[in-house]
Design a protein with these regions (language model features):
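Short, positively charged and aromatic/hydrophobic N-terminal segments
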Residues: 3-5
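N-terminal Rossmann-like FAD-binding beta1-loop-alpha1 element of flavoenzymes
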Residues: 9-36
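Short N-terminal binding/cap micro-motifs at the start of the first secondary-structure element
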Residues: 20-22, 43-46
Length: 139
């Protein structure tokens, strides 16, 4: 078994899923050194299969409307949804070069209908922000 030594880093994130990648990008853009641990090898593994491989990125409803229509535990999501509302999510991916479209039910997908575009973009953005990835299991 091969082991990797992690040198000093400000932030260590366990998992390169959607939340881990977004957190890594945000922290790195704020000047922190970030290391993401991903033993599965590929980033965004589950993200790549969401929405039948199309990736339902967000819901295009206003936060309050979304909380009323969709959530059974709105208190859990409320602060996150208001901190990073659907408009901000759409703007984030538009600026990253991933155009989005809204379909019935206010579901938002990449125009390409390919979840890999979202996962690959998040990985590319993380790397360009200086995020380090460790892709093997650590002891």
């Amino acid at each position: 078994m091969r082991y990797t030594k992690i040198s000093m880093t400000d932030v260590i994130i366990a998992g390169a899923g959607a939340a881990g990648l977004m957190t890594a990008i945000t922290a790195a853009r704020r000047g922190l050194s970030v290391t993401v641990l991903e033993p599965n090898g590929k980033t965004g593994k589950k993200l790549r299969i969401t929405g039948k491989g199309r990736c339902n990125v967000t819901n295009d409803s206003a936060p309050q409307e979304f909380l009323q229509k969709v959530c059974t535990n709105a208190r859990f999501l409320k602060s996150s949804l208001y901190a990073f509302p659907p408009e901000a999510v759409k703007e984030f991916f538009d600026e990253a070069g991933v155009p989005l479209k809204t379909e019935r039910g206010e579901r938002v997908f990449p125009v390409s209908d390919n979840a890999n575009d979202i996962a690959d973009t998040l990985e590319r953005m993380a790397k360009s922000a200086g995020v380090r990835f460790v892709r093997e299991r650590l002891a």
